[in-house]
């Protein structure tokens, strides 16, 4: 699947290839995964201790306002303000294996 326009900002820091971490962790297989568990990436303590799973409700909130969902996380992105972009990015993340 082609990445939606809303994903442009994500790919500045995130790869979609398994095992290829950048400034942020690879997003391959992220949908359904527990937050802070990908190997080879140094997550912030708040991220690791969040206990979140990247499902649709969690991603919907996180992509719109990451700092409220996980206060103190390292991601500098302020969030996607358009709900349609959030939905499109989540649908795209579901396709990444």
UniProtKB/Swiss-Prot annotation:
Coiled-coil residue spans: none
Sorted UniProt keywords: Electron transport, Heme, Iron, Metal-binding, Photosynthesis, Transport
Pfam families: Cytochrom_C (PF00034)
Superkingdom classification of source: Bacteria
SUPFAM superfamilies: Cytochrome c (SSF46626)
Gene3D superfamilies linked to this entry: Cytochrome c-like domain
GO terms under biological process: photosynthesis
Transmembrane spans: none
Positions with a binding annotation for heme c: 10, 13-14, 75
GO molecular function terms listed in the Swiss-Prot or TrEMBL record: electron transfer activity; heme binding; metal ion binding
PTM characteristics: Binds 1 heme c group covalently per subunit.
Described function: Cytochrome c2 is found mainly in purple, non-sulfur, photosynthetic bacteria where it functions as the electron donor to the oxidized bacteriochlorophyll in the photophosphorylation pathway. However, it may also have a role in the respiratory chain and is found in some non-photosynthetic bacteria.
Family: Belongs to the cytochrome c family.
Protein's recorded name: Cytochrome c2 iso-2
Species annotation: Magnetospirillum molischianum
